[in-house]
Amino acid sequence: TQGGKPFDPARGKQYEAGVKYVPKDLPVVVTAAVYQLTKNNNLTADPANPTSGFSVQGGEIRSRGFELEAKAAVSANVNVTAAYSYTDAEYTHDTWYEGRRPAEVPRNMASLWADYTFHETALSGLTVGAGARYIGNTVTYYSSASPKAYESFNVAGYALADATVKYDLARFGLPGSSVGVNVNNIF
């Protein structure tokens, strides 16, 4: 604070409901969830000194959305996971941002992942996998000399590719243990 006093902790409240579907005849799991999160005691720009960099407490952010995920064992060796999430986030109480989407919170995110595990071969226990993630567009705010004090610009969505190689150590007497290398953001 401007007076040097520490802020109170931020508080959150979450409501969530979900379902899980596992068909009897297929090696598939499908989940869906809806949620609402509310964060109180968020820091917001000091209305008395908006461009000073000082904050006051009292802002509130609400996020509502849903998530979908499907996992399938395509074969004894191949697993595929696909996921999608939608988030509608908004400052519901804030000095400058009320009614706006919080910075760096995408509305849409999606991912697709596949892995192949070797069984009963010389490579038994080895898993290789690859996937892609999509992060939708976001908004970012910056300070300006305008009467609004904070302006915004959109940041375009982007996709990332990831990969993994891991080895199950069960054959060495360490069931449940593995070693692996993950490479994120390959391109």
Please annotate each region the language model reported.
Residues 1, 28, 38, 42, ...:
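Extracytoplasmic low-complexity repetitive segments enriched in small/polar residues
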Residues 4-8, 55-57, 97-103, 151-154:
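Outer-membrane beta-barrel domain signature
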Residues 9-66, 73, 85, 89-91:
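Membrane-embedded beta-barrel scaffold of Gram-negative outer-membrane proteins
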Residues 36, 56-143:
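Gram-negative outer-membrane beta-barrel transporters
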